[in-house]
Amino acid sequence: LNEIKVFKQKFTINELTVYPELDLKKPHQLQSDIQLSTGGKISLKGELDESPLMINTQLKIENLALVPLSSYLKQVALLKLESGVVNVDGHLQFSQQAKNQASFQGNVGVSQFAANDIKLNQRFLAWQDLLAKGLKWQLEPMSINVKEVIANKPFTRLIIAPDRTINFENIVASESKTNTKNNKQTMPLNIDKVQVNDGSMLFADLSLT
C-alpha cells in the first residue's frame, strides 16, 4: 500500500497497474484502485498513453465524503457542509492537444446532503438523494447536458428580510461574486427532465411585519 497526500487529504493506493504495450502505437492498459482515508473509493479501468497524454477509462467513485472538502465550498457559498457523499459511474476521456479535450458521460449522485448557513447556523439546504442521470460534460467547447435530475426529499429555507433582501443573496461568497463579474465565459447547461419527490421549504416574509 502506498499513501500519498493531496490537497490536505490522504489517499491510499491499493492498486495502480499499467500494462505496457510492446507495440508503441497502442495505448497501455490502466487499472487503479484508490482508497481515501476520509471516506470513499475511486476506481479506474481503461487505457493510458503518455505522449501526448491520453486517458480513456471507466471511472467509478463510491461514497466519497464531502465534508473534508468543505473549505473549497466556502469560496463559492457561505455554507458549512454537515454531511454528504458523492457517487459517480461513467466514462472519462482526456486528450492532450493544442486545446485540451476532456469529456465525461454517466451518472452522478449526491446522497445524505446537508449544509448550514454559516452566519445563522441554520439548515439552508438538504436532500436525501440528488441524481443526475445521463450526464454529458465536455471541456471544449464547455457544456453540460443531463437527461434527468431526480431529487428525493429536498429541503431549503427561503427568508425575505425586513429590507426585502432574500437570504439566497447573502449565501453567495464575495469572492464568487467578483469572479462571476470578471468571467464573461458562460457554460451552457441543458436538463431535459426534473423530478422532485417529497420536497419541502421553510418560507417566511419578514417584510410584512
Indicate residue ranges for each PLM-predicted region.
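A generic secondary-structure boundary signal that marks alpha-helix termini
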Residues: 78, 139, 204-205
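Outer-membrane beta-barrel domain signature
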Residues: 21, 33, 77-81, 121
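Acidic/polar low-complexity surface segments
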Residues: 164-167
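Elongated, acidic membrane-bridging lipid-handling scaffolds
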Residues: 1-73, 94-96, 101, 175-209
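Flexible beta-edge/linker motif
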Residues: 1, 57, 82, 91-107, ...
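Short amphipathic alpha-helical linker/capping segments at the junctions of internal repeats
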Residues: 128, 169-176
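Membrane-embedded beta-strand positions in outer-membrane beta-barrel channels/transporters
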Residues: 15, 41-43, 87-89, 129-134
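Extracellular/lumenal and peripheral-membrane lipid-interaction modules
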Residues: 61-92, 149
